[in-house]
Curated annotation (Swiss-Prot):
Taxonomic path: Archaea, Thermoproteota, Thermoprotei, Thermoproteales, Thermoproteaceae
Name of the protein in question: tRNA N6-adenosine threonylcarbamoyltransferase
Biological source species: Pyrobaculum arsenaticum (strain DSM 13514 / JCM 11321 / PZ6)
EC number in record: 2.3.1.234
InterPro entries associated with the record: ATPase_NBD, Gcp-like_dom, KAE1/TsaD, Kae1_archaea_euk, Peptidase_M22_CS
Record's function text: Required for the formation of a threonylcarbamoyl group on adenosine at position 37 (t(6)A37) in tRNAs that read codons beginning with adenine. Is probably involved in the transfer of the threonylcarbamoyl moiety of threonylcarbamoyl-AMP (TC-AMP) to the N6 group of A37.
PROSITE patterns for this protein: GLYCOPROTEASE (PS01016)
GO molecular function, one term: iron ion binding
PANTHER family named among the record's database cross-references: TRNA N6-ADENOSINE THREONYLCARBAMOYLTRANSFERASE (PTHR11735:SF14)
Residues reported to bind substrate: 129-133, 161, 178, 258
Length: 332
C-alpha cells in the first residue's frame, strides 16, 4: 500500500510517501516571512500553492513512482492556520478524486508523535511534543493520547520565535536564540509560571523584551530565556513520568532539535529510569512523511473519509482523537 501525505499546517508545505508502513521519503519548502514579521496565513498559503505542484513531481520522480500508484491520500486536517490548511486539503482532495482513492484526515500533533515513535522504535512512551504550535506532555490510555501537561497560551517554540523576531535575531527563532545565548557569562532570573501541570509561556516573551529595553545584554537574555523555558518543561515532564511510570520518554516536534533541551530531558529520564529517545532531525519539523505514516496506520484501522467530507479544523485538541492503531506500532 502506497500512501501520499500532505502537510501544510503553518509555514511548511511538505509531501511524503510511505509504502507498507515504511517511510520512502519526503520533500518540502518553508515559507520565510520578511525580516521582523511573523507568518501571514494568506502569504503562507500562496507560497504553498506555488510550491505544491513541483514538490509533488519531484517526490514522485525521486522515488520512481507514478501518481497512479498511490492507494491512499492523507492530509494534515489541523490544527493550524486556516488558509494554509486548506491548500493541503484541496491538493489531497483533488488527487483522491482523480485517482478514486480514499482520503485520510490526520491530526498534525498526533502525526508528530507517530513519526517519533516510528523512528525511535518506541512502543508506549510518555511524549514531550514541542514545536511552534504545540507544547504538550502526553501518554496513551484508553484509545487516546491523554494530556499530562500543556501550555495555557502560546507554545514554547512560538514564544521563543516571537522574542527572536522582536530582537532582530531572525527566523527560525529557537536555534537563533540558542546561538545568541552561547556567549553569555551569566543568567538572570526569569519568572517560571507553572499552574498545576500546565505552563504559561507568553509571559516569558514579555519579560525578555522588558529586559532588552532595560539594557540587559542580549546574550544573557537569550540564555536565560531558553533555560527558563526548558526547565519549566522539564519540571512538568518529571511529574508526568513519576505519575505514569512510563519506561520510555520520547521527544517530538521541531524544538526537539535543541541540544540543550535534550540534555535537560535526558537528566529527567535518567532520574526516573526512563529511556530518552529523540526524533531524528529529519523528522522533527513539519513534514509530509509523518502525515503519510499516520494516514497509513489510520487507514488500516478503518479511519478515512470521502473527498466531500475532507474538512480542516484550525482548532483541534490532541486528546479529542481516537488512535485505534496505537499498538500496531509496537508490533513492527
Amino acid at each position: 500500500m502506497l500512501v501520499l501525505g500532505v502537510e501544510s499546517t503553518a509555514h511548511t508545505i511538505s509531501l511524503g510517501l510511505v509504502k507498507d508502513g515504511d517511510v520512502l521519503g519526503q520533500v518540502g519548502k518553508t515559507y520565510v516571512p520578511p525580516s521582523g514579521l511573523g507568518i501571514h496565513p494568506r502569504e503562507a498559503a500562496d507560497h504553498h500553492s506555488q510550491m505544491a505542484p513541483q514538490l509533488l513531481s519531484h517526490l514522485l520522480y525521486r522515488h520512481g513512482v507514478r501518481l497512479s500508484d498511490v492507494d491512499v491520500v492523507a492530509y494534515a486536517a489541523g490544527p493550524g492556520l486556516g488558509p494554509a490548511l486548506r491548500v493541503g486539503a484541496v491538493l489531497a482532495r483533488a488527487i483522491a478524486i482523480k485517482l478514486g482513492v480514499p482520503i485520510v484526515p490526520v491530526h498534525h500533533g498526533i502525526a508528530h508523535i507517530e513519526i517519533a515513535r516510528y523512528a525511535t522504535k518506541s512502543c508506549d512512551p510518555l511524549v514531550v511534543l514541542i514545536s511552534g504550535g504545540h507544547t504538550v506532555i502526553a501518554g496513551y490510555s484508553d484509545r487516546r493520547y491523554r494530556i499530562f501537561g500543556e501550555t495555557l497560551d502560546v507554545a514554547i517554540g512560538n514564544a521563543i520565535d516571537m522574542f527572536a523576531r522582536e530582537a532582530g535575531l531572525g527566523f527560525p527563532g529557537v536555534p537563533a536564540v540558542e546561538r545568541c545565548g552561547e556567549s553569555a557569562d551569566r543568567l538572570v532570573e526569569f519568572p517560571m509560571p507553572i499552574v498545576g501541570q500546565d505552563m504559561s509561556y507568553a509571559g516569558l516573551t514579555t519579560y525578555a523584551l522588558k529586559l532588552l529595553k532595560e539594557g540587559v545584554p542580549l546574550s544573557v537574555i537569550c540564555k536565560s530565556l531558553v533555560e527558563a523555558a526548558y526547565y519549566m518543561l522539564a519540571e512538568v515532564t518529571e511529574r508526568a513520568l513519576a505519575f505514569t511510570r512510563k519506561s520510555e520518554l520520547v521527544v517530538a516536534g521541531g524544538v526537539a532539535r535543541s541540544r540543550r533541551l535534550r540534555e535537560i530531558l535526558s537528566q529527567v529520564g535518567a532520574y526516573h529510569g526512563a529511556e530518552v529517545k529523540v526524533v531524528p532531525d529529519e523528522y522533527a519539523g513539519d513534514n509530509g512523511a509523518m502525515i503519510a505514516l499516520t494516514g497509513y496506520y489510520a487507514y488500516k484501522r478503518g479511519v478515512y473519509t470521502t473527498p466531500e467530507e475532507s474538512f480542516v479544523r484550525q482548532r483541534w485538541r490532541l486528546d479529542a482523537v481516537d488512535v485505534p492503531w496505537f499498538w500496531d506500532l509496537c508490533n513492527r
